């Protein structure tokens, strides 16, 4: 397979007289920074000659210390989170318990003798990466492409961008980590087909399906597990060592487990003075975890429509374990691509995309997807989905909405995220109101609502009312972060509750239709002097009573049947002229349009 030439040439000039942009992989465990020139990639090392810089930050002697494996760890997991979420999630609380300011109304950490927000602390890591690169390249760096997990939501993405901005970077693009890894393989160069990216990092698992046609990278589905990664493998091995050799469940035993795992990626056994474990035992221990990742990958393929895939791209240090390659091949019977260092694939892709974005003539395009559906709450609590799950982005969708009651001078918009049919079951992202509308009859006002997601996955919503020329726009920045686990739960709940949700929606829609019909007909009876026959009015009221009883019974089939009965008997029993009026009302016309 032809791939982009990715090497670290001794003679390459990475500080030419041209624009320079770097790629940054801000990881949970380690971070990397790289630069590409003429499609050749160089990972920039730290001052102590490390390419993988631990994503840790400490504050001692009035200075920030980055990468010494002390202090605050895994800050990436805090992006987009609220104080409430931290307090209610033991795994997150354990990360920050020594720094958390529980008296604050928002998430702040007591760090560097100050109360700092997560982006302010993360910015120090970006500054460290920036300084290391500037020192080696002997030039100022201001532009970067930064990778994020495929399931990062708007809040998390926004905080990553803010941290980078504080550090002095202009973020050219946020790209999903699996997409960056695929880009690193040079699949945009005379390659066509569908590829599965299997990304098993230290703390998370991501899988994406990408379609590549004529230099266009399109993500068509994503899936993952935020609580599954190489760290879980370490825990399983640690538990085995504790039970088998009567060792304490301590940091030292965990480090021993990690060493055993790494050794068994290239040897058949691991032995030291205290323990011994062989490859066969390791594989028995971790097989259930590996099978979970395979199942998630297969679910992702189903979401994508079960396309024929041409290869599996491995990303993340944990994929060095031979069992993972073996099980992937058994499951998919296709090429397993691992010829790029899995720890570097993401940052290489980011660096190549950075060069591509600043080059005079770009020759490739990355298209990501929305991880969850986005929509609005309608009357009755129904969700109108506007951008669907796994829709390619960037995208802009326009829909028209109207008022439900007379003399509304404002329309409230409730933006939602999720797969369920009712607003109460989805995640609230934002609310805003379009004010100053002219008081008019229901149905006259027309508001155009535009949902737009940019290439970085940031959502903006605007509304425009034509008659009053009133508009309002917001960039949706949710107050709550949403990680992959929550997304998976949302999708799973949507699947499990699909039938219930569908029935609930049908009922609510039937109730809304019935209430609108009752309102319109009763108003017509009161306002139109053409109705002189008491017998006609009696027939109509009797039919309306049937509809009201059906609504009270909360039976959508009964409601629909009573509405059908109303329409049928009206045609047969009512005066022709009034029949025409009723039919116009049933078609949604306003009473004033047909007086």
Curated annotation (Swiss-Prot):
Keywords: ATP-binding, Chaperone, Nucleotide-binding. GO terms for molecular function: ATP binding; ATP hydrolysis activity; ATP-dependent protein folding chaperone; unfolded protein binding. Gene3D superfamilies: 1.20.1270.10, 3.30.420.40, Actin, Chain A, domain 4 (3.90.640.10), Substrate Binding Domain Of DNAk, Chain A, domain 1 (2.60.34.10). One of its GO terms (biological process) is iron-sulfur cluster assembly. InterPro entries: ATPase_NBD, Heat_shock_70_CS, HSP70_C_sf, HSP70_peptide-bd_sf, Hsp_70_fam, ISC_FeS_clus_asmbl_HscA. The keyword Cell membrane does not apply. It comes from the Bacteria. The keyword Nucleotide-binding applies. Belongs to the heat shock protein 70 family. PANTHER family: HEAT SHOCK PROTEIN 70KDA. Chaperone involved in the maturation of iron-sulfur cluster-containing proteins. Has a low intrinsic ATPase activity which is markedly stimulated by HscB. This is Chaperone protein HscA homolog. The lineage of its organism: Bacteria, Pseudomonadati, Pseudomonadota, Alphaproteobacteria, Rickettsiales.
């Amino acid at each position: 397979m032809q791939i982009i030439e990715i090497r670290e040439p001794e003679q390459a000039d990475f500080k030419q007289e041209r624009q320079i942009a770097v790629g940054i992989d801000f990881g949970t465990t380690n971070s990397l920074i790289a630069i590409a020139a003429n499609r050749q990639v160089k990972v920039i090392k730290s001052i102590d000659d490390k390419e993988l810089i631990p994503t840790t930050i400490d504050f001692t002697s009035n200075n920030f210390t980055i990468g010494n494996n002390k202090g605050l760890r895994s800050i990436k997991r805090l992006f987009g989170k609220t104080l409430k979420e931290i307090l209610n999630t033991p795994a997150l609380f354990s990360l920050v318990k020594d720094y958390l300011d529980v008296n604050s109304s928002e998430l702040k950490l007591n760090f560097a003798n100050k109360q700092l927000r997560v982006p302010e602390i993360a910015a120090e890591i970006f500054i460290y990466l920036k300084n290391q690169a500037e020192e080696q390249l002997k030039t100022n760096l201001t532009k970067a492409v930064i990778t994020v997990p495929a399931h990062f939501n708007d809040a998390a993405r926004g905080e990553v961008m803010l941290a980078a901005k504080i550090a002095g970077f202009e973020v050219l693009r946020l790209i999903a980590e699996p997409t960056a890894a695929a880009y690193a393989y040079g699949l945009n160069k005379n390659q066509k087909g569908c590829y599965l990216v299997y990304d098993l990092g230290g703390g998370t698992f991501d899988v994406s399906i990408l379609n590549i046609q004529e230099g266009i990278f399109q993500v068509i589905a994503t899936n993952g597990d935020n609580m599954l990664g190489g760290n879980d493998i370490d825990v399983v091995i640690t538990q085995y060592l504790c039970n088998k050799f009567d060792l304490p469940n301590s940091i030292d035993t965990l480090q021993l487990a990690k060493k055993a795992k790494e050794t068994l990626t290239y040897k058949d056994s691991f032995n030291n003075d205290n323990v011994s474990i062989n490859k066969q035992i390791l594989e028995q221990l971790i097989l259930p975890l590996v099978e979970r990742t395979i199942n998630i990958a297969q679910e992702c393929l189903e979401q994508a429509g079960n396309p024929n895939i041409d290869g599996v791209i491995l990303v993340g240090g944990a994929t060095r374990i031979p069992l993972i390659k073996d099980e992937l091949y058994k499951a998919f019977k296709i090429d397993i691509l691992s010829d790029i260092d899995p720890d570097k694939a993401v940052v290489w892709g980011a660096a190549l995309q950075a060069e591509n974005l600043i080059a005079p003539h770009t020759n490739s395009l990355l298209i990501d997807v929305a991880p969850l559906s986005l929509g609005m709450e309608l009357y009755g609590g129904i969700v109108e989905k506007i951008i669907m799950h796994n829709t390619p982005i960037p995208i802009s969708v326009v829909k028209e909405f109207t008022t439900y009651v007379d003399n509304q001078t404002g329309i409230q918009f409730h933006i939602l995220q999720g797969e369920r049919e009712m607003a109460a079951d989805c995640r609230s992202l934002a609310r805003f109101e379009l004010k100053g509308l002219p008081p008019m009859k229901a149905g006259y006002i027309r508001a155009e609502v535009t949902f737009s997601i940019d290439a970085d996955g940031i959502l903006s919503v605007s509304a425009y009312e034509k008659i009053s020329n009133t508009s309002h726009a917001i960039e949706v920045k949710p107050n709550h972060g949403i990680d992959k686990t929550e997304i998976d739960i949302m999708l799973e709940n949507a699947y499990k509750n699909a039938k219930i949700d569908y029935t609930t929606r049908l009922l609510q829609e039937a109730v809304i239709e019935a209430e609108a019909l009752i309102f319109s007909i009763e108003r017509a009876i009161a306002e139109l002097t053409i109705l002189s026959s008491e017998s006609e009015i009696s027939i109509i009221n009797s039919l309306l009573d049937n509809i009201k009883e059906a609504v009270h019974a909360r039976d959508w089939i009964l409601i629909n049947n009573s509405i059908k009965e109303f329409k049928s008997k009206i045609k047969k029993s009512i005066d022709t002229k009034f029949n025409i009026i009723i039919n116009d009302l049933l078609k949604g016309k306003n009473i004033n349009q047909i007086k």
